[in-house]
Amino acid sequence: KGAEVVRMMQTLATGGASGISGREGFARGMKLYFERHDGQAVTCDDFAQAIADANPDSALATRLDAFKRWYAQAGTPRLKAAGRFDAETRSWTLTLSQHTPATPGQTDKWPFVIPVAMGLLQADGTPVAGSERVLVLDSAQQSWTFDALDAAPVASLLRGFSAPVILEWEASEAE
């Protein structure tokens, strides 16, 4: 899962207030990594730390210790998604929960930091303006609410294979 973990680092290196993209943040982190460690024997922690240090306001930097569970904890997380539309408030709430089954030697699992690239679509497949974003699931369960919707949207989750998880989503035939 090494390549997937590095790709998640890139996704999470997006610079919050600075507005830089994940690719730009990742490139800054790579530059810092080589400045610090060129020619040295290094660890995965050194690499992750450099990416985070180059992007101090990023989702990666603010959750680095928890993100490192991808290197220490075995198994593939199962991500369960559920959506609920409230016509009265014109809002749709997405709830994501995660669970990683026990593996030999690791019966108790901590939540992973999971970037979920997503967007919302109208029933006809038209994108809902302003809905594309990366949600960061870093606990067992979290919810996000999207407002000013005229009808229940269809969620497009894990765009670009943003995380190596198994998605459980009870979608209708139309979705």
Give residue spans per PLM region.
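Catalytic-domain carbohydrate-binding cleft regions of carbohydrate-active enzymes
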Residues: 2, 29-30
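Non-catalytic accessory/interaction domains
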Residues: 5-8, 12-15, 20-27, 35-175
